[in-house]
Amino acid sequence: MLSKQIIGSEKTGRFALLDSIVRHGVIHIFGYPGGAILPIYDELYAWEELSLIKNILVRHEQGASHAADAYSRSTGKVGVCFATSGPGATNLVSGIATAHIDSVPILAITGQVGRPFIGTDAFQEVDIFGITLPIVKHSYVVRDPRDMSRIVAEAFYICKHGRPGPVLIDVPKDVGLEKFNYFSVEPGQVKIPGCRPLSNLKSRQILMAAKMIQQSSQPLLYIGGGAIISDAHSIIKELVDLYKIPVTTTLMGKGIFNEDSEFCLGMLGMHGTAYANFAVSECDLLIALGARFDDRVTGKLDEFACNAQVIHVDIDPAEVGKNRIPQVAIVGDVTEVVTSLLNLLKNNFKPYPEQIISWQERIHRWRQQYPLLVPKKSTSISPQEILVTTNQLAQDAYFTTDVGQHQMWSAQFLKVKSKHWISSAGLGTMGYGLPAAIGAQVAHPNELVICVSGDSSFQMNMQELGTIAQYKLPIKIVIINNRWQGMVRQWQQAFYGERYSHSRMTEGAPNFQKLAEAFGIKAFTVNNRQNMESSLKDAMKYPGPVLLDCQVTENENCYPMVAPGKSNAQMIGIAKPQRGTASNYVSRNI
């Protein structure tokens, strides 16, 4: 490897750090320099000169953590971010927490004050090791540079093995500068028994699951982010092809199954499709693959899939039975489990019962009765129209989103491939979408990357336009601008007596077109149907970055919606269009 050509017998801790991450295949990091991490950035200068690695200079450390997160989600590799001590390190916390709850392997490397100053409340000293313990798989403080290579190797192992997640390495300034006789720990040399994925792939559980599938007349596959991480899309397709089982996904599982398929019901849960929610309420067998049974999916938990037996497959034993006790619990990787299950089903194939045909017909009727609707306004454009048109123009794009109404509409109306959907699901982090688009675009420089944001979310990290401009990243930014904190307004309207406390965003709102142009980024304002499609077409064709300020209907609500404390079958906003108003809507089935 190239890095071996510049190894001598005596090296510094900072050299050991960079050499170790390069040995693990890292070619991009996202970071921001500062006092305690300056020795590492000084070393980085030489490594970049040799084209061994490249730092993407973000405008805020939160942007670095989100970019590393999206880099990982879109590639399956470990994303790496750098920050200095104190406020630099604490600025990473939201991004680390986002990665933790969504099981994303990122490695956060922070500078720290020198060892003699730790515990003295030195300038920019913060116990980032302690702060991050609840939101990482593991944290390290490097006390001796001789441990650096081993710690990095362990960190990469921990990030990826078992249920993925973030790891933090805190590097005191003087550790980076200290010289020692360097010997590298190569990738693959580290084995940590506690991080090995547990597995109970016993023939008894697989056999029970197979029998339940063969006996079910109303089965449903409920698929989460664990299946994406496992790259299980091909094996899941085989299972669906064999037994014609309908598929619904979580927000994290979106893209695991062909969204144009007649068997795909789209997302379930609070803002899921009506037919997915009806299906989960009526199924007699729920096959959960890499999903957590979280509150946004289940609604009222004791009424979730209350008619169903449950098979739950997850790599994390802590998730199995946490919220819903399954009849069959299988701890293991989704691909491995479904492969074993499929082999057994093929060897003992029994034609699926005729009742499954009536189950499919029933779901088809729900689709026809309660489709997703795209409102067509006479004087303005709806958010749904923007998203449907964008998807038609960019069918193979990577989509990142922020959090709020636009995120839920995107989940409803965008059809994506596996690992092409990048969104903060568990933590719901506003400001995620723009830096996430940076990470995805750096990972896939020749692919189309689109950031769908809201006017409120966008303002959380809009400084990252500077990063996009600096590196000429051809990201397309679609702002769904309704001049509100849209989801907050919707909840205030529905549950807080229409008291709109601090959710209006008109006063002090920037002109997004001029803002982008100030960074040298091409921008359009889209405010009517006449210029909507042409502006979107021009944006997708343009070779550089583009921002579109899409000024949409202000008071559009995101439906269907399962209200707090209600079951998934008790959705609001799913009434069929009244007679005579059909021309005001376009049906959009997933």
From Swiss-Prot:
Residues 405-484 are annotated as: Thiamine pyrophosphate binding. GO terms for biological process: isoleucine biosynthetic process; L-valine biosynthetic process. It catalyses: 2 pyruvate + H(+) = (2S)-2-acetolactate + CO2. InterPro entries: Acetolactate_synth_lsu, AHAS_TPP, DHS-like_NAD/FAD-binding_dom, THDP-binding, Thiamin_PyroP_enz_cen_dom, Thiamin_PyroP_enz_TPP-bd_dom, TPP-bd_CS, TPP_enz. GO terms for cellular component: acetolactate synthase complex; chloroplast. FAD binds at residues 163, 271-292, 314-333. Gene3D superfamilies: 3.40.50.970, TPP-binding domain (3.40.50.1220). One of its GO terms (molecular function) is flavin adenine dinucleotide binding. PROSITE patterns: TPP_ENZYMES (PS00187). Its cofactor is Mg(2+); thiamine diphosphate. Pfam families: TPP_enzyme_C, TPP_enzyme_M, TPP_enzyme_N. Its EC number is 2.2.1.6. NCBIfam families: acolac_lg, PRK07418.1. Dimer of large and small chains. Belongs to the TPP enzyme family. This is Acetolactate synthase large subunit. It comes from Porphyra purpurea (Red seaweed).
